[in-house]
A protein has these predicted regions:
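N-terminal beta1-alpha1-beta2 submodule of the flavodoxin-like/Rossmannoid cofactor-binding fold
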Residues: 1-95, 102-104, 108-111, 194-201
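Residue-level signal for short, function-critical loop segments
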Residues: 10-13, 97, 142, 176
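A short helix->loop->beta-strand "cap" motif at the edges of active sites that frequently abuts
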Residues: 34, 133-134, 167
Length: 201
């Protein structure tokens, strides 16, 4: 049975354009794969992922036998996020752009799943990702027009991070110009909808 993990990163939950795009794809995927297991994770709304601080980082690097109860709880939370990824065959990310970057809660999520020896390992040829054999779809919603410009650091950051943990098969779908004008918004959403239909076919 195929497992799809949907990660929505908007602070506006399902009311955001990025979440709506991701939801559209997941609905189409479910229609084509009725037996698929769908798992949802909202990293910025409902129960936001905590930001990394010294105490949380210390929990990750402490030897298991030396961890306090609080540190064990931090690692257990990280493990639960990682386990979702490990079990997933398909990953869907709803990605808004906030001030040219990713939501800070998504960065916090990445910080909790990038664990040496768990999701990647070091080798004499560089880091090796361990979350292999997965397909990822990223649905990015932006108010302006950024694809192909130096301001689109978001795409390379997300692609590089996913590759770092072993997820190299990644497709991006963009809905851009959503705040430029009503016509631009309509065109941007229509283009994204066409891409979703193509990917879900």
């Amino acid at each position: 049975m195929t497992t799809l993990l949907q990660i929505n990163a908007s602070i506006n939950n399902d009311n955001s354009q990025s979440s709506r795009l991701a939801n559209q794809f997941v609905a189409a995927f479910r229609d084509r794969h009725p037996d698929a297991k769908i798992v949802s994770r909202h990293v910025a709304a409902n129960e936001p992922v905590p930001h990394l601080d010294g105490e949380r980082f210390g929990a990750f690097i402490a030897p298991p036998e030396a961890r306090s109860a609080a540190q064990h709880a931090v690692v257990a939370y990280s493990d639960s996020l990682i386990n979702e990824l490990q079990r997933a065959d398909v990953i869907v990310l709803g990605l808004p752009m906030y001030n040219f970057g990713v939501p800070s809660q998504l960065k916090a999520y990445f910080d909790h799943i990038a664990r040496a020896g768990v999701t990647f390992k070091y080798s004499d040829k560089g880091p090796v990702g361990l979350l292999t054999g997965k397909k990822a779809y990223v649905f990015a919603a932006r108010g302006g027009l950024y694809v192909g410009t130096p301001l689109d650091t978001q795409t390379s950051y997300v692609r590089d991070f996913l590759r770092f943990v072993g997820i190299s098969d990644v497709e991006f779908v963009y809905a851009e110009g959503l705040n430029v004008s009503p016509q631009s918004k309509e065109a941007g959403l229509a283009k994204a909808a066409a891409e979703i239909a193509r990917l879900a076919a």
